């Protein structure tokens, strides 16, 4: 059974020859470039490290590393696709504060500030990100937007995709499908309904989150109209993506919608069911009616009480399964939702165990989680909870993937 077959078995609730393993198939399942560079050097791989996602300084995971770690998945998004078709040395070379030399996409624009920080500029030359001196990530900087009221008239979600992006994705999808056996996940034009508070269009939160949450309660008609426009726009983009890549992808990331905190959901489940769920249902219905894709949702935090609503709305796959959050224990999730939704993640806690534990503690933790999530027939893909951070000991990363491979085989025997 090859990787693509293995993943398809798992997401269709059939028993694979081993539990599939993911690293970097979507942006929130990857690895910071600093620890990635350490890991691949221990493998004897000395190639330049490319940055796939600038804000988070996420590495572009190379094919040799994917194979060495027994990874079954591979991403399809415009950032990774463009990089895959380009030699690293054509990128923008820059040293991170730790001294590591990496390559950013050629169009990346930085500006160093007098205080030693870096700011990130968009195509118009406006600052939209800042990394403090000696920092590891860029933070979004939108103080003027956050201080203004939401104006629904100005909310104009992007409803088209450039020919250049579609052409890049089409070529890369064909290349990945024909020259690898890995399962391909598409990512782009995903919705953010729980966190939607916009002065202009994008799939990232702008303006005031608390104002948007209040609108969901007291300005329901306006909020619904905005979400209708959002879903309409996303469907138009997904239609273009599907025309470009078709069935080369088995799933598409339709939503990056962080709906929980460490302790609870961001709103009452009843409000979610009334205001948010219908829009998810319409989007999922379009995907399932017009494509063969599985619907992939990324949502961090304690989201236990939203999961049944997402299942009813048509979400097929849930990531990152933040097991360290309240009510998100593997046993509870499998007892209540096993066989109803694919859990993609939850394999290793990245808040405490992976960065702070010993390799042996990591191994025991990974074995326990796999034994629970893989206790049914299919329905599970191993992935750590969200991205592996820069301060994680590389020995722990090795322990996690070694144990995952060994134990993912064992539980399927």
Regions found by a protein language model. Name each.
Residues 21, 66, 74, 110, ...:
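Generic structural hydrophobic/aromatic packing signal, biased to beta-strands
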Residues 93-169:
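A gly/proline- and charged-residue-enriched helix-loop-helix capping module
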Residues 36-84:
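Segments that shape or occlude catalytic/ligand-binding pockets
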Residues 64-68, 100-101, 110-111, 175-179:
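Short, charge-rich binding segments
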Residues 1-40, 45-51, 131-132, 140-413:
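Active-site loop segments of alpha/beta catalytic cores
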Residues 75-90, 188-193:
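Short, glycine/charge-rich beta-strand/loop segments that flank catalytic centers
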């Amino acid at each position: 059974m090859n990787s693509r077959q293995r993943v398809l078995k798992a997401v269709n609730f059939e028993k694979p020859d081993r539990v599939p393993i993911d690293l970097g198939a979507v942006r929130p399942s990857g690895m910071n470039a600093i620890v990635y560079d350490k890991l691949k050097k221990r493998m004897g791989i000395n190639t330049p490290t490319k940055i796939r996602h600038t804000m988070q300084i996420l590495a572009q995971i190379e094919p040799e590393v994917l194979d060495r770690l027994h990874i079954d998945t591979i991403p399809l998004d415009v950032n990774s696709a463009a990089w895959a078709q380009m030699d690293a040395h054509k990128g923008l070379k820059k040293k991170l504060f730790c001294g590591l030399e990496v390559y950013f996409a050629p169009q990346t624009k930085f500006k160093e500030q007098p205080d030693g920080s870096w700011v990130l500029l968009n195509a118009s030359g406006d600052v939209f990100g800042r990394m403090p001196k000696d920092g590891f990530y860029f933070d979004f900087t939108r103080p003027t937007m956050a201080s203004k009221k939401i104006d629904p008239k100005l909310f104009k979600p992007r409803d088209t995709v450039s020919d250049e992006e579609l052409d890049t994705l089409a070529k890369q999808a064909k290349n990945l499908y024909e020259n690898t056996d890995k399962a391909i996940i598409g990512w782009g034009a995903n919705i953010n309904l729980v966190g939607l508070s916009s002065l202009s269009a994008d799939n990232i939160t702008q303006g005031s989150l608390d104002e948007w949450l209040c609108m969901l309660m007291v300005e329901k008609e306006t909020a619904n109209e905005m979400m209708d426009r959002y879903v309409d726009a996303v469907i138009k983009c997904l239609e273009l993506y599907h025309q470009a890549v078709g069935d080369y992808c088995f799933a598409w990331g339709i939503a990056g919608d962080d709906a929980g905190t460490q302790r609870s959901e961001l709103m009452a489940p009843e409000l979610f069911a009334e205001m948010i769920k219908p829009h998810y249902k319409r989007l999922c219905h379009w995907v399932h009616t017009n494509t063969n894709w599985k619907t992939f949702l990324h949502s961090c935090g304690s989201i236990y009480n939203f999961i049944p609503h997402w299942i009813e709305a048509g979400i097929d796959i849930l990531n990152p399964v933040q097991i360290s959050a309240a009510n998100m224990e593997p046993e509870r999730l499998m007892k209540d939702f096993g066989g109803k939704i694919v859990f993609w993640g939850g394999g290793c806690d990245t808040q405490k165990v992976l960065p702070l534990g010993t390799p042996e503690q990591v191994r025991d933790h990974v074995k326990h989680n796999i034994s629970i999530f893989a206790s049914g027939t299919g329905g599970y893909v191993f992935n750590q909870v969200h991205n592996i951070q820069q301060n994680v000991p590389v020995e722990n990363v090795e322990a996690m993937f070694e144990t995952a491979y060994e134990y993912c085989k064992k539980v399927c025997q």
